[in-house]
Amino acid sequence: MEAAWLDRFLGLLPRQSTVLDIGCGSGEPIARYLAEHGCKLTGVDSAPEMIAICRDTFAQQEWCVADMRSLSLRRTFNGILAWNSFFHLCPDDQRHMFSVFQAHAAPNTVLMFTSGPSFGEAIGTFEGEPLYHASLDGAEYRALLDKSGFAVVAHVMEDPACGRHTIWLAQHL
């Protein structure tokens, strides 16, 4: 389901790019897809058990236990991905994340993230457990991207070809 968007993301990157996967979870299916397409990954997740799975499954890649909100790796990447992770932060933390994206971006860095379709907060469920979701509105995401030096390349709300995800693809100027 994500392959078409991941291909768009990869299409904007140089070959054998470095990619920062923020909120990588277990690495399936996103990290696997990117690694199979030649990317050198640095995955970050706040859950040690998720990073342990990544280290076992993708030993050639770099994995870090860290809170995305305070992430400071002191280096930049060709690509930054926050797929199905960023929207679990409250609105104020999402606003702050744009400085984190900017700190890890070089000229031409490609950023892709998922959000909700409109401003609001909701509690969903995942594997029977409550799961928090939040979103800013589209105009605010655009303003934050612009302020952080990113230009929107593509934005689709509730993409029917991608599980109704709302997707943002941008490039650092």
Model regions: which residues?
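Conserved alpha-helix/loop element of class I SAM-dependent methyltransferases that forms part
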Residues: 1-17
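Conserved beta-strand signature within the Rossmann-like core of class I S-adenosyl-L-methionine
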Residues: 108-115
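A short glycine-rich, Lys/Arg-flanked "PGG" loop and its adjoining helix->strand segment in the class I
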Residues: 95-107
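Class I SAM-dependent methyltransferase SAM/SAH-binding core
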Residues: 20, 26-70
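Acceptor-substrate binding/catalytic loop of class I
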Residues: 124-139
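Core SAM-dependent methyltransferase catalytic element
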Residues: 157-173
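Short "lid" loop at the C-terminus of a central beta-strand within the Rossmann-like core
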Residues: 116-121
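A conserved beta-strand element that flanks and buttresses the S-adenosyl-L-methionine
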Residues: 81-82
